[in-house]
A protein has these predicted regions:
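Short, Lys/Arg-enriched, Trp-marked, Pro/Gly-tolerant hinge/linker segments that flank
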Residues: 131-143, 155-177
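Residues at helix-coil transition
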Residues: 57, 126, 154-157
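Generic protein-terminus/edge-of-domain signal
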Residues: 1-63, 67-75, 83, 118, ...
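A hydrophobic/aromatic-rich effector-binding and dimerization subdomain
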Residues: 2-10, 17-24, 83-151
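Short histidine-centered beta-strand/loop micro-motifs
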Residues: 40-46, 63, 88-90, 111-113, ...
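Amphipathic, well-ordered alpha-helical segments in soluble domains
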Residues: 51-54, 117, 144, 148, ...
Length: 177
């Protein structure tokens, strides 16, 4: 997992450039140290990929065209594909650290046009009203997903079978939606 302190854009665009994102495994894991970003925020941006995140510590605010959501430590969520969003660190008492899985839906769905994509993935990623799906402790089903999410960041990329284990974990979480 790579520690990140800034965001990069494609030239002339608000589309985020995702360093290390490869076609043969369309996924990156990041540990965003939001207190180290200029102004303690990530400016407006978007990406074709899905963003699945967990708040390790602190709290952040997600802004989208549809509104604002606050995510304290222990919560998480999904930012849908192609959603314009920004985040800002809120906590001033502890570090604001966000763990992120950023991936192309093909990682879960397989080949474009597959039955899995059509039946389970496309209805979510093509729904413009779904910008962010929040996950908070206190709801049994959401807590189950949050535990899987937190555990998914402890998988070691050096371990044999990492890619298979990670994809299976992401699929298990996606199935819960």
């Amino acid at each position: 997992m790579k520690n990140i302190h800034s965001i990069e854009f494609y030239t002339g665009s608000k589309e985020e450039l995702l360093p290390g994102f490869e076609k043969d495994f369309p996924y990156i894991a990041s540990r965003a140290e939001l207190d180290k970003y200029i102004g303690h925020y990530v400016p407006w941006h978007w990406h074709k990929t899905v963003e699945l995140f967990y708040m390790e510590s602190g709290s952040i605010e997600y802004d989208t065209p549809g509104g604002k959501l606050l995510f304290p430590a222990g919560s998480g969520g999904i930012v849908n594909s192609n959603v314009l969003h920004m985040t800002k660190a809120i906590s001033q008492k502890e570090k604001n650290i966000q763990l992120l899985h950023i991936f192309d839906v093909s990682l879960l769905a397989g080949e474009q046009g597959s039955r899995i994509e059509q039946k389970y993935i496309a209805p979510i990623i093509t729904a413009p009203q779904i910008e962010v799906i929040p996950l908070f402790p206190g709801n049994a089903e959401e807590e189950r997903i949050l535990k899987l999410l937190a555990a998914s960041f402890r998988l070691s990329s050096d371990e044999f079978g990492y890619e298979i284990k990670l994809r299976e974990t992401l699929r298990n979480m996606a199935h819960a939606f």
